[in-house]
Design a protein with these regions (language model features):
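Active-site helix/loop module of the DD-peptidase/beta-lactamase fold
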Residues: 30, 70, 81-85, 97-144, ...
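Active/ligand-binding-proximal structured segments within catalytic/core domains
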Residues: 90
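Catalytic loop of the DD-peptidase/beta-lactamase superfamily, centered on the K-T-G motif
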Residues: 21-62, 195-200, 204-208, 212, ...
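Second-shell loop/turn segments in exported
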Residues: 22-23, 79-81, 116-120, 149-154, ...
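Catalytic nucleophile serine of serine hydrolases
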Residues: 84-85, 181-184
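The feature captures the short pre-catalytic strand/loop hairpin that immediately precedes
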Residues: 161-173, 234-248, 313
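N-terminal leader/targeting segments and the immediately adjacent pre-domain N-terminus
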Residues: 1-80, 96-104, 111, 129-140, ...
Length: 469
């Protein structure tokens, strides 16, 4: 299938970024120019909205369209699928339920499932609610043998019974808590068991515990007719409209839709600009639970995991953030506690893996890190069958992402965990590039000419990935 899951959306590359000399927050004009470049020049989106909040207030900058040929303007009330940013809401539910005494972080997940479901364990260690929130459960990104009836809406037919059957028969590859590995299944399962504990469904729980308390009227799984009229149409990397995603069973992993204004309201509460009874739960949610989840080279950002949030620390400062993606959308939400600035970036296009999807815009506004460079010109060559086969395999790009290089009908493809499959074009026997993105891959060829590792080059960054056994 073309899309396994855009719900996995952590940045692929985390090598050392460069910072601009001017650390002033960009003006509306400067932000609009960035969006115009992404839409008009790079053709990486159809319509984007950026929201910024700080002590001076909030502002919305938009560019592009709801759909190709749709004259209606984008604004702060335009609806987008926010994908994995939903996991932040799910983990806030967890923190709030801990505050209320309804659950504990160390509770085994099995406590909140039917007796007929056999949760996997290993060496006497059970998966806990904390393990699910911090992606150290040992559960895979999503169910192995995940075969949707409709690849364009891949989670629509994934049922609770299928999830229960998978869990009951799954063997953990490692002890729970041992290693960070991003898991949509884990995020969705967390939302499921919290809703079971509360005696309701996930959407109702989010509305009762979070959105109604914060006045977020435009954040929901199921859109009202009025909200649906404001929904930006999602697009694929070729800027063609795609279906919206329905995620009934794994709703806690990525089912929410929202707007820039609503997400800025959420960040206002995180930053202390909006009084809320969720204050203590939000503070608890940002406590780092595991440091340096993606070890990298000198000067590279440190990535830590909190409850649902990713905490990025580098020379530009600390940013608490998450991003998201579904079949036709890419999103970013984050805040800088030191400067008390929050940023939301929403795009109604899911570009090819490797293309700038909006994260760099968010970090640029929050810390002054430089924006991604536009794709460069390449020259294609033809490789013989043996040369292509030597490059195929699975490479450990980062703990939460494997890059699979496959050969199908004589053509090479790459697919990072949770991303679209994309064609790889050769410009030398050991160097491939993505057509629609500023990303290249260099392979190290071992004995016999078989690739032993690769390096992904993107936005001036180089990240090595060894071949997996």
């Amino acid at each position: 299938m073309k899309i396994t899951s855009g719900l996995v959306a952590l940045s692929l590359l985390v090598a050392a970024p460069a910072w601009s000399q001017n650390r002033t927050t960009p003006s509306d004009t400067q932000i609009r120019a960035i969006l115009a470049d992404r839409i008009d020049t790079r053709k990486q989106s159809v319509g984007m909205v950026v929201g910024v909040i700080d002590a001076k207030g909030r502002r919305i900058v938009s560019y592009g369209a709801l759909n190709q040929g749709d004259p209606r303007p984008l604004d702060g009330d335009t609806e987008y699928e926010i994908g994995s940013i939903t996991k932040v809401f799910t983990s806030l539910l967890l923190a709030d339920m801990v505050e209320r005494g309804e659950v504990s972080l160390g509770d085994p997940v099995s406590k909140y499932l039917p007796p007929s479901v056999k949760m996997p364990s290993r060496n006497g260690k059970e998966i806990t609610l904390l393990d699910l929130s911090t992606h150290v459960s040992g559960l895979p990104v999503e169910q192995e043998s995940f075969k949707p009836a409709d690849p364009a809406n891949p989670f629509a037919d994934y049922t609770v019974d299928r999830m229960y059957a998978f869990l009951s028969g799954y063997t953990l590859p490692r002890d729970p808590g041992e290693k960070f590995e991003y898991s949509n299944l884990g995020g969705g399962l967390l939302g499921h068991v919290l809703a079971r504990r509360a005696g309701t469904d996930y959407e109702t729980l989010v509305r009762r515990r979070i959105t109604s308390r914060l006045g977020m009227k435009d954040t929901a799984v199921t859109l009202t007719p009025a909200m649906a009229k404001r929904l930006a149409v999602g697009h694929d990397a070729g800027l063609k409209p795609v279906k919206n995603w329905d995620i009934p069973t794994l709703a806690g992993a990525g089912a929410l839709r929202s707007t820039a204004n609503d997400l800025l309201t959420f960040l206002a509460a995180e930053l202390g600009f909006k009084a809320t009874a969720l204050k203590d739960a939000m503070a608890e949610q940002t406590v780092v639970r595991r440091a340096n989840i993606m070890p990298s080279g000198p000067g590279a950002p440190e990535l830590d995991i909190a409850l649902g949030w990713i905490v990025r620390k580098d020379a530009g400062g600390t940013v608490i953030w998450h991003n998201g993606g579904t079949g036709g959308y890419r999103t970013f939400a984050g805040f800088n506690p030191a400067t008390r600035t929050g940023v939301v970036v929403l795009s109604n296009t899911n570009p090819d893996a490797g293309a700038a999807a909006g994260d760099d815009i968010g970090f640029h506004i929050l810390t002054g890190s430089k924006l991604s460079e536009p794709p460069q010109a390449h020259h294609e060559i033809v490789l013989d069958q043996a040369a292509k086969e030597a490059l195929t395999g699975r490479y450990q790009l980062r703990p939460d992402s494997i890059l699979a290089v496959t050969l199908e009908d004589g053509k090479l493809f790459g697919q990072a965990t949770g991303q679209e499959k994309f064609p790889l074009i050769a410009e030398s026997p050991n160097r491939l590039y993505l057509k629609a993105a500023d990303a290249e891959i260099t392979f190290t060829l071992g004995p016999g000419g078989r690739a032993s590792s690769l390096v992904v080059h993107q936005n001036g960054r180089d990240v090595p990935a060894p071949r997996m056994p």
